[in-house]
């Protein structure tokens, strides 16, 4: 039977995910169009923050699967690829931070945040993030699950 369900055009976003327990998977997230955004697609950050427990993904063997948000530790994408967001022109602060995960692993990178009046402390910055905090690592952008962060040093 032919597929008669109309589907929206999506943009593939290649990612490497690390799951609780240490397994790594190369996957593809499918980003919906968003003409209101500069890059024309919904940023991966917004997809990860949506109120859903499972994410549909493409797998390396061309099959499909579902990833549990609760099992995600990190989601890593190309910093110049689809799924990223342009940096605001003004009011952006860059800080070198180290995230100490509950597993004992450390992730060091650049935290980009927008200064909000009255919210200048690092605790304010981290409390403003949702389920994931984006950290720049050279040419990569890593979304780290905030539930997996034990402490932050800067």
Give the positions of each predicted feature.
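Conserved RNA-binding domains used in RNP assembly and mRNA/RNA metabolism
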Residues: 1-154
């Amino acid at each position: 039977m032919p597929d008669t369900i109309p589907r929206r055009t999506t943009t593939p976003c290649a990612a490497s995910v690390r799951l609780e327990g240490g397994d790594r998977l190369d996957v593809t997230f499918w980003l919906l169009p968003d003409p209101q955004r500069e890059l024309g697609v919904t940023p991966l950050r917004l997809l990860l923050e949506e109120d859903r427990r499972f994410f549909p993904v493409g797998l390396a063997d061309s099959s499909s699967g579902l990833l549990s948000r609760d099992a995600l530790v990190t989601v890593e994408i190309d910093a110049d690829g689809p799924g990223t967001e342009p940096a605001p022109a003004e009011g952006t602060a860059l800080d070198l931070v180290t995230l100490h995960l509950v597993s004992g692993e450390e992730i060091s990178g650049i935290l980009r945040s927008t200064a909000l009046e009255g919210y200048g402390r690092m605790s304010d910055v981290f409390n403003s993030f949702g389920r994931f905090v984006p950290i720049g690592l050279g040419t990569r952008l890593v979304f780290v699950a905030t539930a997996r962060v034990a402490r932050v040093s800067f």
